[in-house]
Regions:
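Start-transfer (signal-anchor) and selected internal transmembrane alpha helices
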Residues: 1-27
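Transmembrane catalytic cores of multi-pass membrane glycosyltransferases
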Residues: 28-45, 52-70, 185-192, 197-323
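Short hydrophobic/aromatic helix or loop-helix immediately within or flanking a transmembrane segment
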Residues: 45-49, 64-87
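Transmembrane-helix motifs of polytopic, lipid-linked glycan transferases
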Residues: 94-117
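Aromatic- and kink-enriched transmembrane "portal" helix at the membrane-lumen/periplasm boundary
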Residues: 125-152
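Membrane-interface transmembrane helices that cradle and orient dolichyl/undecaprenyl
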Residues: 153-172
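Signature aromatic-anchored transmembrane alpha helix within multi-pass, membrane-resident enzymes
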Residues: 336-365
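Extracytoplasmic
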Residues: 364-500
């Protein structure tokens, strides 16, 4: 009877924990919003649609396909869509929700091992849920993107692997890290690096060595010939548009955002060790040692002109997982020492952190619906144009539009390729980022951008020149359009026109 009662209580507790994780996941989704097709989704969502329909993008597939050669992410999502018959929009949103749930579940598992107090565990999860769109200093990354990104899924798997290592089950972490590597190799490599330091910190002889030496050593570098090849001038031109790639050009506050968390984890290690909180102390030591090592690696990689070919690897992305742990532990400490069991403190805490992040997201995507539900008619004028193009123009249509359209007021960084599902001439923002990763695209990118120089003053003769040079037969222009174009659709801001 007592055993049955104990099992029942345990099951109810597990169910309650699951419901809390799902509840915080729903809250996180509601706060951060959902914007398919923005920013990097111009690569991933476009590739998924191309996998499902190879007839799409006959003129410009290299601007997304080449960058994704090292990942299976788009193919796996496309495979799920084929297997289930669920629409692209619905499946992508479901995967985003699943990634949020897995991320918060993994954070909860970590918090349970680091903190004995249940209120601390849930406060940590609550703060992570609220702060998913927190920028990571200097890196142009968020903890979690507002669209389905390979990094979202890989990070969730890395966090789950960390929880297994903390639980003393290192072998369970290996397949998770391998899958993460197949999804996002760079983030997985950094995750593997952290797991290595965590394993060392939990290993008693290594922990004693850390305490006595308190330093980190750089591994020897293996020379690779391609690293020292002279860079393509057009590749350098694209690279120079990304100032966040250059560590030594960061502002002082970006440096503070990089070094400050490492100092905090060093302090946490010392305090937790004095208080006898052994696991928390070792975890903090692992984060500190990992951060110091990766910071030194980044300073070497980005400090010598001869190593410029390594710049697109963006070694400062190591901060991404550090910020995850910073938010998780900050929330847990807040819950342990300040929130405690006070309902009013918890209510104020949740209101402030979620309300402020929600307001920030509404300001960032002010012209779009906060959650862009599948099948819902868009209110954004650019998305209205993309929707018309997707259903009313030939699959092989080739478009030109303002090469800086992503920065246009009310556009909110939505990708034409991903949402209109048509080919376009290279743009000056997202395609430039692609060239930094794929140098061989430099000549094509530069030629197309130069041909679009002075776009705002284009007249019919300029559009006819694009048609003759590249085969472009459609354009998206501001309404009212230049005379002579055969316009098929317009709203108050934009017109979609054929080039005669």
């Amino acid at each position: 009877m007592h055993e049955y009662t104990g099992v029942t209580v345990l099951r109810r507790k597990s169910l309650f924990d699951l419901l809390l994780i799902l509840g915080f996941s729903a809250l996180a989704f509601a706060v951060m919003g959902y914007h398919p097709g923005i920013e990097d989704d111009g690569i991933y969502l476009t590739a998924i649609k191309s996998d499902l329909n190879p007839a799409l993008f006959p003129h410009d597939a290299e601007f997304f396909r080449l960058q994704l050669q090292a990942t299976l992410f788009d193919k796996w999502v496309a495979g799920l869509i084929k297997l289930t018959g669920i629409s692209v929009a619905a499946m992508v949103m479901m995967c985003q929700l699943a990634a949020i749930v897995l991320t918060l579940y993994s954070c909860w598992r970590i918090a349970r091992i680091l903190f004995a107090e249940e209120r601390a565990q849930w406060a940590g999860v609550a703060l992570v849920a609220a702060m998913l769109t927190l920028p990571v200093s200097g890196t142009a990354l968020f903890l979690f993107d507002q669209h389905l990104h390979a990094r979202n899924v890989a990070s969730a798997l890395i966090l789950l692997a960390v929880s297994w290592i903390l639980a003393g089950k290192r072998w369970q972490a290996i397949p998770l890290l391998l899958v993460a590597f197949l999804i996002h190799p760079i983030m997985a490599a950094l995750g593997i690096s952290f797991c290595f330091f965590l394993t060392l910190a939990l290993y008693e002889p290594a922990h004693l060595w850390f305490q006595s030496k308190r330093n980190a050593t750089l591994a020897g570098a293996v020379p690779l010939g391609w690293i020292f090849q002279p860079p393509n001038p057009l590749w350098r031109k694209a690279l120079d548009t990304r100032t966040y790639y250059y560590l030594y050009k960061w502002a002082w506050y970006e440096w503070l955002g990089a070094i400050g968390p490492l100092v905090l984890f060093w302090l946490l290690w010392r305090v937790a060790r004095r208080r006898g909180e052994n696991v928390l102390a070792r975890f903090a030591l692992a984060v500190f040692a990992y951060g110091v090592f990766q910071q030194l690696v980044a300073m070497v990689m980005l400090g010598f002109p001869s190593l410029v070919r390594l710049t697109p690897l963006q070694p400062m992305r190591y901060l991404h997982i550090v910020y995850f742990f910073l938010v998780l532990i900050a929330g847990a400490l807040f819950g342990k020492y300040l929130l405690k069991a006070s309902v009013w403190r918890w209510a104020a805490f949740l209101l402030v952190v979620n309300g402020s992040m929600f307001a920030a997201q509404r300001a960032e995507f002010s012209s779009s619906q906060h959650i862009e539900w599948p099948g819902r008619a868009p209110s954004n004028p650019w998305l209205q144009a993309f929707a018309w193009i997707r259903t009313n123009t030939p699959t092989d249509a080739y478009f030109a539009l303002d090469p800086r359209y992503l920065e246009a007021p009310s556009e909110d960084y939505h990708s034409f390729r991903a949402l209109a599902e048509r080919s376009q001439l290279a743009d000056a923002i997202k395609d430039t980022a692609v060239v930094t990763q794929v140098p061989e695209l430099g000549p094509v990118w530069n030629r197309q951008l130069e041909a679009q120089r002075g776009w705002k003053d284009f007249q019919l003769a300029d559009f006819e020149r694009l048609k003759a040079e590249f085969g472009v037969d459609w354009v998206v222009v501001r309404y009212q359009p230049p005379a002579g174009l055969a316009c098929q659709w317009h709203n108050d801001e934009l017109a979609v026109c054929e080039i005669p």
